[in-house]
């Protein structure tokens, strides 16, 4: 059986995000979902066990379950919450939790590391990202890596656009992409 994942929520002015942690760090961050914001609704990996703190749980129940969460994950969750709220406020985060990209390709990891270097309020094209990772003809593959990003917002795939500043796609939906860019002072 796989090591357990811990699923925790983060309440923001934009809704309740769902963060999923492994023993190595933040593995996924999911956008709020209408009517299901308090439960995990991302990609599942087999028969994993989970510790889940849903917002609908009572305070007493949540406090009891929080004690089951390893201290390292509680610290990572605090860093995730702080970074997420900073980005949503249009600021650069000072600290990130460790990111768990286990099972991802080296190409995807290279694209995501390059995305982490895009400052808040700035954008890059898929072509510019391909050049940044020394794969100038891999624009479409960069788009695929953006779509496969399991930690959107913190790994800012919303800052990557198609040529001529066209919005392109976004795993969280185009409304979220517009919203995130607007929060960073960018209007398209």
Q: Positions of the model-derived regions?
A:
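LysM (lysin motif) carbohydrate-binding repeats in extracellular/periplasmic proteins that recognize
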Residues: 136-139, 180
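Short Lys/Arg-enriched helix C-cap and helix-to-coil transition segments
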Residues: 153-160
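Basic nucleic-acid-binding alpha-helical/helix-turn surface characteristic of O6-alkylguanine DNA
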Residues: 1-136, 187-188
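Short amphipathic alpha-helical/adjacent loop interface patches that line ligand
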Residues: 77, 81, 150, 174
């Amino acid at each position: 059986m796989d090591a357990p994942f811990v699923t925790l929520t983060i309440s923001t002015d934009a809704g309740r995000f769902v963060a999923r942690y492994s023993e190595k760090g933040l593995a996924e961050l999911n956008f709020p979902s209408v009517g299901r914001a308090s439960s995990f609704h991302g990609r599942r990996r087999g028969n994993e066990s989970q510790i889940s703190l849903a917002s609908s749980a009572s305070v007493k129940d949540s406090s009891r379950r929080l004690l089951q969460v390893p201290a390292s994950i509680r610290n990572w969750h605090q860093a995730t919450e702080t970074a997420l709220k900073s980005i949503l406020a249009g600021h650069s985060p000072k600290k990130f939790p460790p990111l768990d990209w286990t099972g991802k390709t080296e190409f995807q990891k290279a694209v995501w590391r390059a995305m982490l270097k895009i400052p808040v309020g700035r954008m890059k094209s898929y072509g510019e990202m391909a050049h940044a990772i020394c794969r100038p003809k891999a624009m479409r593959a960069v788009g695929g890596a953006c779509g496969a990003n399991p930690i959107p917002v913190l790994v800012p795939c919303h800052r990557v656009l198609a040529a001529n500043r066209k919005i392109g796609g976004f795993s969280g939906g185009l409304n979220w992409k517009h919203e995130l860019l607007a929060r960073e002072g960018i209007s398209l």
